[in-house]
Amino acid sequence: MKQAVFITGAAAGIGRAVALEFAHQGWFVGAADLDEVGLASLKSEIGAERCFTTALNVADAKQWDKALASFWKASGERLDVLVNNAGILSAGAFHEIPLMRHQAIIDINVSGVMAGCHTAYPYLCKTPKSTVINMASASAMFGQPGLASYSSSKFAVRGLTEALDCEWAEQGIRVKSIWPLFVQTNMVVGLDKLPSVKSLGIKLNVDDVARAVWYAANDRGETSPIHYPVGLQTKVLNLAIKLSPAWMSRWINQRMSSEH
């Protein structure tokens, strides 16, 4: 029976690239988003018989219930991989961004991932060797100035991923996260003035991340990692922060985020 993946935020950007990667590998694809026009385009590209689409606000648990129940039937009762990709961000000084916007970032980026994992659990249990892939970020390494609430949300995703990977091990479910730096998508439009973007540039594209998701989903060895940094820059930064004392990690972060 064909393996099946369900992806949130799949109408454009990273989510769309992930959907196309899995479709290219012969999987049945479930794609969810609020952008129904983008979903229709994706379904046309993959083929209606190989793609299920649904409108989904990831912060709404009831919508998750309906979406996954419908996907389960359409996929032949399989959920091999859940990709929690949907997310939003706002850049700028923390105190200048409205509190409601900060709360919306947490609702989508954290509550949406929690709702997805919670709702998907019984389906994952019924599918042997299933995997959850949560889209985190290099911002989960060290709190990033100018992206305070976004970075906070990705730290939460990191913690949830680590906890569930241990908690669900008895059920044979792996839970992993992907850590890209800045990626060439609509999400980074307007971020060119952010000091960390000036320092590091935007080197990754959506296909780089999609390939990392595919690799992580199929990397199920006992020694396989939980977190997957994407790209050389991210891997070097991750190693530097791991090996550096706290004061040096803070200094590195300040240097990357400095206007000077």
Predicted regions: what is each one?
Residues 1-28:
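Canonical Rossmann dinucleotide-binding motif of NAD(H)/NADP(H)-dependent dehydrogenases/reductases
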Residues 25-41:
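Conserved glycine-rich Rossmann-like NAD(P)H-binding loop of the short-chain dehydrogenase/reductase
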Residues 36-37, 55-66, 99:
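The beta1-alpha1 cofactor-binding region of Rossmann-like NAD(H)/NADP(H)-dependent oxidoreductases
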Residues 93-94, 98-106:
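Substrate-binding pocket helix/loop in short-chain dehydrogenase/reductase
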Residues 117, 153:
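Active-site helix of classical SDR
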Residues 137:
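Residue(s) in the substrate-gating loop at a strand-loop-helix junction
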Residues 177, 197-235:
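C-terminal helical subdomain
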